[in-house]
């Protein structure tokens, strides 16, 4: 059953069942959805996977529409052979600053025997004649990308940049300061099991 509320620009559904080939695979006793293009807080599509190394892998992201220029996505992930991982993505945009901060954290990896994490922050801005920014990338260990596929991996050739910069521009002169450090992923240390 579905109810549409045009005044609130939202719909409500009850007793929904997703069937594949006539077989029920997912059910929801209650859910809401927007009727317009406006963003709305709520669950996003879950992601299911399975592999011999990770076992059953289930992610259920929840999107928080904090404000028109701020949002946050929390993604709990259960990996049956490894443990529980929490993914985070925070995005923001205002007059002098914009960026995104993403991270994943696993308090204890059953296979690795320790905590695991990744962090990416890309923040940039300008104010008057100044420009500034941070591009920070870090993982807990050399094997993180092989064990947990992540978008941070797409941006690197086994070197994770950690850049901070500030520049000033005027009609007659320019100045810039940049501090750079890298985390090198040592592929020769990675074991294959």
Predicted regions and their residues:
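Outer-membrane beta-barrel proteins and related beta-barrel translocases across Gram-negative bacteria
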Residues: 1-193
């Amino acid at each position: 059953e579905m109810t549409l509320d045009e005044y609130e620009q939202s719909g409500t559904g009850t007793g929904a069942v997703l069937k594949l080939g006539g077989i029920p695979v997912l059910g929801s006793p209650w859910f809401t959805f927007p009727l317009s293009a406006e963003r709305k807080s709520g669950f996003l599509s879950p992601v299911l996977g399975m592999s011999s190394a990770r076992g059953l892998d289930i992610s259920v992201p929840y999107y928080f529409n904090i404000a028109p220029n701020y949002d946050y996505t929390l993604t709990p992930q259960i990996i049956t052979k490894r443990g529980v991982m929490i993914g985070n993505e925070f995005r923001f945009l205002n007059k002098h600053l914009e960026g995104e901060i993403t991270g994943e954290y696993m308090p204890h990896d059953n296979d690795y025997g320790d905590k695991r994490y990744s962090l990416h922050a890309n923040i940039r801005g300008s104010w008057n004649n100044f420009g500034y920014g941070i591009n920070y990338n870090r993982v807990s260990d050399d094997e993180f990308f092989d064990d947990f596929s992540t978008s941070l991996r797409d941006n690197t050739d086994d070197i994770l940049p950690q850049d901070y910069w500030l520049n000033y521009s005027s009609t007659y002169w320019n100045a810039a300061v940049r501090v750079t450090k890298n985390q090198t992923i040592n592929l020769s240390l990675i074991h294959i099991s």
